[in-house]
Amino acid sequence: MATIKDIANRLGVSVSTVSKGLNGASDISDELRQMVLDTAVEMGYATKRSKKVENRKLAIFIENMDYEAATQFGYEIVLGFKQNAFRHNWDVTVIPVTPAFQLAEKYDTYMLKNGFCGAFLVGFALHDEWMKQLEQTTMPTVLFDNYIKKNPNVAYIGTDNYEGIDAAVDHLYTLGHKKIAFLNGSLHSMVSEQRQEAYYNSMKAHGLEINEDLTVYGYYVADSAKYHVPTFLGAGATAIICGNDLI
């Protein structure tokens, strides 16, 4: 485990300067503070504060998902996490993020400088900058409907997309439908890719023809349907499977 002195030696600065950078002191430059934080993360440093039992701060980073109203998809996900955290005496901060935010702030550095012990990431896309950084993160992290290989610090939870889509195809097949369209969600999403694969597999398993005109990526919003349903109907679809509830 790296020490403050190790960081100081790496950067060629004093121990007190490193301490100021780690603790957010105002009498060093933003550039030097960022350099200290980035180096601390690179060297695997953990502050004493983050190792203390009483420091129990978690972050929920959320992107591409509404969560503030009870009717929105992310509401119960965020609420459930916060309720369970509260029962175990954890403080939770919900932080909406954007692609620009991820480019401006390195994940581990942001966690370290804000004293977070772990995080729950919801709604992220496969090509997001932080998803790349999570391959090497040392911070305890849980992903919702996403997956990072070969990093024991990153776990995930999610739905069984294969079983769900297969059940939908099977239900429509038993009702006599043969031309089943699939309006998927956003491209570059792990769940979209899995649901697309599940659709293809289930159609083949039921002996149904796959028509590429009946399979499209849209977006996880209600307006997505109006752009594609007319095309589906024109191609002879008698049933449509949607990638999520909003569509």
Task: Tell what function each PLM region has.
Residues Q102-F116, D223-A235:
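Short, well-structured alpha-helical segments in soluble
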Residues M43-Y107, C117, Y200:
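Amphipathic helical "hinge" segments at domain boundaries
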Residues H127-Q136:
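Active-site-adjacent beta->alpha loops and helix N-cap segments on the catalytic face
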Residues M1-E54:
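N-terminal helix-turn-helix DNA-binding module of bacterial transcription factors
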Residues C117-A119, A239:
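Short, Asp-centered acidic motifs that coordinate Mg2+ and/or phosphate
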Residues M1, R10, V15, E42-M43, ...:
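Bacterial carbohydrate/catabolite-sensing allosteric modules
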Residues M65, T98-Q102, V122-H127, L246:
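Short beta->alpha connector loops
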